[in-house]
Amino acid sequence: MAISNKQKAAIAAIVLVGGVATGGVLLSGRSAPEEQGGHSESKGHGDTEHHGKQAAEADHKDDKSHGDGEHHEVKKGPNGGALFSRDGYDVEIGTAESKGEARIRLWVSKSGKAVANGVAATGQLVRATGESQALKFVVSGDALESQQPVAEPHVFDVTANVTLPGSSSPLAVRLSKEEGKIELTADQLAKTGVVVQTAGSAKVQAGVQFPGEIRFNEDKTAHVVPRLAGVVESVPANIGQQVKKGQVLAVIASTGLSDQRSELLAAQKRLDLARVTYDREKKLWEQKISADEDYLSARNALQEAQISVQNAQQKLTAIGASNSSTALNRYELRAPFAGMIVEKHISLGEAVADNANVFTLSDLSSVWAEFVVSAKDVERVRIGEKASINSASSDVKADGTVSYVGSLLGEQTRTAKARVTLTNPQMAWRPGLFVTVDVFGADVEVPVAVKTEAVQDVNGESVVFVAVQGGFVPQPVKVGRTNGKVIEIVEGLKPGARYAAANSFVLKAELGKSSAEHGH
């Protein structure tokens, strides 16, 4: 049957419309699965690994698997760690307490069931200070746990390579922590006055520190005794009084002194008589009137009388009594040297013995800082070495030298006594005051040292605040020798690390506030 031109045109229109509709159906059918499945990563994610980041953790880059430049957020696992997935396995990395210490832990699961056997992992922890720590993982229960504990502060990045069962290549997982970081802007840093310096080598004196106590200088301390028994008539001196040499401390009525003065007076009278007799006999002997025997006898008597007077005088001098007095029994007890009366055991009307300790007098212009040296430190403390004395209850400081080190160790304590002699013109060092004695040796070059004021005590641990991007991190350190200005860092800090050298106490206060707010 012949088809007219109108019929041909109608058929062509129908075919065209049907083709367009079919193409639309095909196009819509191709895009629907992609919309339902999210995004295809057959080329960009050949390993089907899922990457991302938690809001509190640092960004990570995965250029190889993210060939399209996409960025994904890390999923949070059921244990609060970062969750990664591949080949049906879920790997969560985080921290957990074990045996009282924090450790890095890996939780591996497949289809919701924990998998530990057949999984191996190694890793590396890098701190904000640049220090790195290799990590080895062992199976612990239904997870893998680092053999090495992780010390505070928990500000670090961890990368671990996890080998899964049946996998040809390890899965890289990452964890970032910023617990305890003190965040400060440049303006805040300027307002707080915190000064940042670089840790490096310095010269410090090899020294050792001892607890000590200020004591009387025993070379200038005396127990004053009367040396004659008697009754106290007056006591013009008082405890705490500064006295001069020869000043009267007490007056005692002594019968013994009366006898000695009487003996002197009698000896002087006998001497006068012997001198007159000798002069007369000498003249007669010169005139050939007196015999030689009489002259020699008179001269001998004179010499004996002189000896008796000298003996009586020296007895009085030995007890500190004057040769003459208005009262023969009056004994004036005088200060043997200038000093302060620190003890007094005498009162008016009291009968005292000749050996009674009635006063203790000490010249406090010089005192001793005594300390005890253990057997292991005896070789480090030598006579003549420089020492620094610091009061435990005030800001008083003084420098001196070691004046004595005991040559014998105590039988029970196994320690030796040592002391530093200090001048005390202002009487700032009082006997009984507890002090700290730092004994210094020769200068020693140490690889890492910081300012002494940079070291803060946080929960009984020495800490230096290290400058990191955006703030500071409290870094535990082990300190060594110090000269009072700089202190050696034995562990915990590397040369070149930037730290808070001045006003670090501000950071300590901020750390305390943060701990109180977060309960950490």
Curated annotation (Swiss-Prot):
Gene Ontology, cellular component aspect: membrane; outer membrane-bounded periplasmic space
Coiled coil: none
Cysteines paired by S-S bonds: none
Ranges for region Disordered: 28-85
Keywords associated with the record: Cadmium resistance, Cobalt, Plasmid, Transport, Zinc
Highest taxon of the lineage: Bacteria
Biased composition annotated in UniProt, kind: Basic and acidic residues: 32-76
GO BP: any one term: response to cadmium ion
One GO molecular-function entry: metal ion transmembrane transporter activity
Listed Pfam families: CusB_dom_1, HlyD_D23
Transferase as UniProt keyword: no
Family listed: Belongs to the membrane fusion protein (MFP) (TC 8.A.1) family.
Alphabetical list of NCBIfam families matching this protein: 8a0102 (TIGR00999), RND_mfp (TIGR01730)
Known function: CzcA and CzcB together would act in zinc efflux nearly as effectively as the complete czc efflux system (CzcABC). The CzcB protein is thought to funnel zinc cations to the CzcA transport protein.
Protein name: Cation efflux system protein CzcB
Gene: czcB
